C-alpha cells in the first residue's frame, strides 16, 4: 500500500526520483497517466490491470464513459525506473499537471499521485473541509 507525502524535485531532463518506500511495490514496470485534479497517477501493473478491466466494461454508448476512457488511456505511458530510482515524465504529462521543479509525491493506497507543489497547496486550501465535514462525507460513503 502506498502512503505518505514526499517533497521532491524534477531535474532539467524531466526526471523525478521515486520515494524509496514506493519502489518495491511499484515493481520493474508501471503506468504513469493523467490524473484528476491536475495531478498524475502512477499505478503498479497489477493495479493498472484492475482499473483497465473496469474501464473496458464501461458502455461505449455512454458519452461520459467514452470521454473518461479516452482521458485515462491517451495519457498513459509505461515506465521503468532508471538505476538511480528515477522516472522520466514526458512533456505532455508534465504540462497536464503543471509540473516544473518542486513536486509533491503522495501515496494514496493503490496509487501514487504526483502534484506540482503549487497545485497541491492550492488543492488543500480550496478543499477547506473541516474534519467534521470529511467525517460526515465518509459516513455517507459507508466508511
UniProtKB/Swiss-Prot annotation:
A Pfam family annotated for this UniProt entry: MraZ
Protein's cellular compartments: Cytoplasm, Nucleoid
Transmembrane segments: none
Gene Ontology process terms (BP): negative regulation of DNA-templated transcription initiation
Xref: InterPro entries: MraZ, MraZ_C, MraZ_dom, MraZ_N, MraZ_sf, SpoVT-AbrB_dom, SpoVT-AbrB_sf
The keyword Cytoplasm is assigned to this record: yes
Entry annotated with the keyword Transcription: yes
Residue intervals of the SpoVT-AbrB domain: 5-47, 76-119
GO MF assignments: DNA-binding transcription factor activity; transcription cis-regulatory region binding
Keywords, ordered alphabetically: Cytoplasm, DNA-binding, Repeat, Transcription, Transcription regulation
GO cellular component: cytoplasm; nucleoid
HAMAP family: MraZ
Subunit-level organization: Forms oligomers.
Family: Belongs to the MraZ family.
Protein name: Transcriptional regulator MraZ
Natural source organism: Alkaliphilus metalliredigens (strain QYMF)
Gene symbol of the encoding locus: mraZ
